[in-house]
């Protein structure tokens, strides 16, 4: 087929679209059931593949297996079909996902097992996705873009993704202006509200390559990637999503040749929100997926968060592998970058953190901490194997301090327990203090890390 069953639809329940069907849409907005649902969808399953292609997409692309625009609740709905959107040259804003391209309602008890992918040579400007302005391509296992206003609020609960989620640009050096941030996430590409008790098992893959393999530093081409969500860049106020009780077990592989500005990659969330004191929190989340960074990208990568945000009782067990990239990149078992007084409490940083090329900071808890006042880190545990990086910007708790002037205290009420190894040296009670933090910008009395040996 080439068109949805309906343009707009009310309540639909107990429906299966069989795998013998296939859809090749001719319009840039598509969902098998409808362009938009204004009534609830319940117990609807799609098994059919959707393939959308063009030489170039000049208009916004919104494609979900069931609906393009989810404007009412979606419950117990499932997709096993592959969703493929391809532009031979360029595309602008795009929302590609396993259930709904855009969601301004509650989605719960839903799943995706299909491969979800969007690819183009380069991004040629931005588009409006329903009511979200200046959008870039976003790909999500279940949802690509979220909406949030007085008419409806994005929320995703008890959902699972098992399919590969893929975002590819093959010629980013063809862009002529800064590109808004592209998102890719196992559950949601660009969230705009709470995500609760969701689980990702599929690979999250992003490739933003230049045509000749060289670093592109003239224009921005940023990617935000996370096992659960890319993050809140397009959310209301750029800070809307609490992520609670979620797990990622899928590998996250990011290749990029964009080196002008920081991309952000996290096992749970890439970019938690704007770089300020935040009101949202990533809580009770676990990452078990390995994260691999390559290309010439400038990146902040961490097992739970790539960029800065609040974290409570989160754990990373996956390996962070920096194969190659820009020397200004930072990586950490828990988070790549942390700043603005956001809090990290009762979190656990396990796994391996490996830099196979030069980085600006490598840490167990935090790769790089900003020059902003902090009092946090209470009850945290670090048991990492750290390899690579320079001694001056490497540490079990903090790799690099960005400045010398702001008071930073970690583990004041409950010291941080540290163990593991650094550059092949096993940490013990006699030597742990030598490996707690890097020396760059460290200022005694201003920077205080209360740590003890132990697990």
Q: What do these predicted ranges mean?
A:
Residues 2-455:
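Surface-exposed loop/turn motifs in large extracellular/passenger domains
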């Amino acid at each position: 087929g080439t068109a949805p069953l309906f343009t707009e639809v009310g309540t639909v329940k107990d429906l299966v679209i069989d795998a013998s069907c296939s859809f090749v849409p001719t319009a840039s907005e598509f969902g098998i059931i409808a362009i938009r649902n204004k009534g609830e969808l319940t117990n609807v399953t799609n098994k059919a593949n959707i393939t959308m292609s063009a030489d170039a997409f000049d208009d916004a692309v919104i494609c979900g297996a069931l609906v393009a625009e989810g404007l009412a609740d979606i419950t117990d709905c499932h997709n096993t079909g592959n969703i493929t959107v391809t532009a031979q040259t360029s595309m602008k804003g795009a929302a590609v996902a396993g259930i709904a391209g855009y969601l301004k309602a509650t989605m719960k008890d839903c799943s995706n097992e299909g491969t979800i992918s969007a690819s183009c040579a380069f991004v040629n400007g931005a588009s409006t996705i329903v009511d979200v302005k200046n959008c870039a391509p976003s790909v999500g296992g279940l949802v690509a873009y979220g909406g949030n206003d007085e008419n409806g609020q994005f929320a995703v609960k008890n959902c699972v993704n098992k399919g590969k989620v893929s975002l590819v640009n093959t010629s980013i050096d063809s862009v002529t202006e800064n590109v808004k941030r592209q998102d890719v996430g196992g559950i949601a590409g660009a969230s705009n509200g709470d995500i609760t008790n969701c689980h990702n098992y599929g690979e999250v893959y992003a490739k933003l390559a230049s045509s000749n393999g060289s670093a592109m530093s003239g224009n921005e081409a940023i990617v935000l990637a996370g096992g659960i969500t890319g993050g809140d860049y397009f959310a209301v106020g750029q800070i809307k999503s609490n992520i609670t009780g979620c797990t990622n077990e899928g590998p996250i592989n990011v290749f990029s040749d964009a080196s002008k500005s920081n991309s952000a990659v996290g096992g749970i969330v890439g970019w938690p929100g704007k770089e300020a004191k935040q009101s949202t929190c990533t809580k009770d989340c676990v990452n078990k997926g390995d994260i691999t960074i390559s290309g010439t990208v400038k990146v902040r990568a961490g097992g739970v968060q790539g960029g800065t945000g609040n974290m409570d009782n989160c754990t990373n067990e996956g390996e962070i592998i920096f194969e190659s990239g820009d020397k200004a990149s930072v990586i950490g078992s828990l988070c790549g970058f942390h700043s603005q007084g956001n809090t990290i409490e009762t979190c656990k940083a396990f796994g391996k953190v490996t830099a196979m090329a030069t980085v600006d900071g490598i840490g167990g808890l935090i790769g790089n901490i900003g020059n902003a006042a902090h009092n946090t880190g209470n009850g945290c545990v670090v048991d990492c194997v750290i390899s690579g990086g320079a001694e001056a910007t490497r540490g079990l708790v903090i790799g690099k301090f960005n400045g010398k002037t702001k008071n930073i205290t970690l583990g004041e009420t409950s010291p941080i327990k540290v163990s593991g190894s650094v550059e092949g040296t096993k940490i013990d009670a006699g030597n742990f203090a030598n490996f707690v933090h890097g020396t760059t910008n460290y200022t005694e009395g201003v920077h205080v890390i209360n740590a003890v040996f132990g697990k």
